[in-house]
Amino acid sequence: MKILLIHCHYRLPGGEDAVFAAERALLEQHGHTVVVYERSNEEAAHGAAKALLPFRAVWNRRAARDVRNIMEQQHIDAVHIHNTLLLLSPAVVRAAKKCGVPVVLTLHNFRLFCPNGILLRDGRVCEDCPHHGLHCALRHRCYRGSRAQTLVVVAAYWLHRVLGTWRGIAITTPTEFDREKLLEFNKIHPTFDENRLVVKPNPVTVPTGPVTLWEERKRQFVFAGRLEELKGLRTVIEAWRILGRDAPLLLVAGDGPLADWAKAQNLPKVQFVGQLPRDALHRLMAESRAVVAAS
């Protein structure tokens, strides 16, 4: 098959980008021809593009036109869409639907019903928007702490809910928990076809090569991921502060909004290695005692 993959990268690399890359590789390994349409929110970080972003996040005509042209010229058999926020907009979903081929959308979060996507606010579970409406996010500035930016996200998802953008397509989500929550929210605010929502776990790349025995590994732990509250980095740093000189070496791989705070703690047993390529990260994990997962 010839498959079109569509994805908008965030300004900071994250898990969605990794899944997108892994699925692309998996499809190609199994003999499919993969055509990629990808953009990055970094493109709209400055100048006129930044000024136009609030409008394009709701409906990006150019992106929709690009998708239609690719599908017509490349004779695409199926479309798999990942993230559309902010630069692509859900308009690319509508464009793909109009071309008459199967369309699959992977939901990596709960953004159809929750503007910040994670059902958390101030460190606690929050389901105000799924139960009472997207407008609740405006009161709490749920997207990046900005009422203006939250308004853009609310407008985009409200409009495309009304237009039925997510109906008539297959939707995948990585876990059964996600599926159950999405079905619960969809009964309150009908947004997609419930019978077309399925669980598709994220692919896992299994490292190959020699295995280092545990007793031969270095006395170090690895924290890998976006450096933000959601991933539990603050908790990990505080734990290493308490352990003090008795702590093993902690290698922090990644970048994000908490990077400056974490580095400012100046803990002797914590080192920051930045954003690593997947192979380098796997090698680092292979020679370490354990991986810290705190989210």
PLM feature segments, named:
Residues A224-G225, L233-Q271, D279-A280:
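A conserved nucleotide-sugar
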